């Protein structure tokens, strides 16, 4: 299928495999070559490689490979990407270690640490036998690689505070039904980069800068100032001088990923997002900090290297391809031999 765009972008989904999996995809934006992925799967339908092409020719710039254990957990992950400006190489050569199904250690064997700030890659910040810990509910409570010393959870198993070893912390506030209402960032300016829309002020601790985001329905406020109004297919901002609304719209792919953001005011492309399998952002993405809603339309938080997608019920890490907490509905089974297809005539 072809999805044409008013701004000269197209998305082409390659022929599907007999099992329903997609064998490849092509995409292109104005002024860019045609980019492609060709997918390979194992006998259980799990993605084993994504071969990358530009203008129909094989390229090793964004190649990825995966292997799994018998329970479906990723054992190894190899990912190439942007290391420096116009220089590409292997950014992630990861091996995973588990305690049952709980990920306890990730080691990055890649030779070079990418210096390109917009690239999304795994930061191997520790070398311990156990780098991640969990509570009795299966929620991750610390991550030494990310310098996270403690993650605290509320009664709904939603993260309410993330503490870092440099003294920084992130606080979450929710409504009674678990809907996120506010995020407060207390960041050490000497060890963390502040958000692009930073309006922070010094808080009680002279080392920390405080900034915050509030969510009121479809309105998003940053430091008490209306930042955007979320609408179907995009969002609205306001001109600082005239206070007139400016409409921005997304061009999505077949998964609902926001690939392109277009300003209705003049029709120019404000943002281009290129995605790895599992939702990570490629280094060739343009103006990727324009707005935070990316993979499957979910909000990406890159503050202090967090790199988590907020799916509402829980958070997802696209760099490792792992969730940070249990699925609340994982044990809510139907009384049927076949659960996923919701059968009616085969019910027991």
Which ranges hold each PLM region?
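A motif-centric feature for acidic-aromatic and gly/ser/thr-rich catalytic loops and repeats
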Residues: 94, 239-312
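Cysteine-centered, disulfide-bonded loop motifs in secreted/extracellular proteins
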Residues: 11, 72, 138, 256-258, ...
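Short turn/helix-capping motifs enriched in Asx and small/polar residues
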Residues: 265-281, 304, 312-314, 318-345
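Short glycine/serine/proline-enriched coil/turn segments at secondary-structure junctions
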Residues: 31-32, 56-58, 302-305, 332-334
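Activation loop
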Residues: 2, 7-8, 271, 291, ...
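A cytosolic small-molecule/anion-sensing beta-strand core signal
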Residues: 7, 155, 254, 317
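Single conserved hydrophobic/aromatic residue that forms the stacking wall/gate
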Residues: 1-13, 338-348
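Acidic/glycine-rich beta-solenoid
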Residues: 9-10, 14-176, 181-248, 285-294
